[in-house]
Amino acid sequence: MDEQEIQRLVEEVSLQYFGMPFLHKALFNSRLRTTGGRYLLNTHNIELNYRYYEMYGKEELVGIVKHELCHYHLHITGRGYKHRDKDFRELLKAVDAPRFCKRMMNEEKEKKVYMYECMGCSLQYVRRRQINTKRYVCGKCKGKLILIKKTS
């Protein structure tokens, strides 16, 4: 799906579900990571995440488009366009748009785990962040800490 196809899709969804035309640009933004799409208040454009289309298909993309068009049409008409606004929630229900998009699969970062051991009492510490072993000591016996395992 290219830029012209997504523009046409957004215009069709706008007329079909909202009965109002979409007069601005709809485009894919490759820099979007965790969100399905976003409505830009200053330009009135809609940016969509292409990876959601690749992963979940056109149905999920149409749901994201409907969600962003709710923001668009409410903002254009001067009504409450934010997620917490009553107008927004009512319009979402009326057009059967999702409040949130699905989570991206395989997007979880592998969590690094650092394991430290006290040289004095052999107490082990598991941390997600690396610590400076020259500055910190064991809380139990004040012994020196050494890094024994780094898992990524």
Swiss-Prot record:
InterPro entries: SprT-like_domain, SprT_Zn_ribbon, Uncharacterised_SprT-like
GO biological process terms held by the UniProt record: response to stress
Record-annotated membrane-spanning stretches: none
Pfam families: SprT-like, Zn_ribbon_SprT
Domain of life according to the entry: Bacteria
Membership in a protein family: Belongs to the SprT family.
Protein name in the entry: Protein SprT-like
Upper classification of the organism: Bacteria, Bacillati, Bacillota, Bacilli, Bacillales
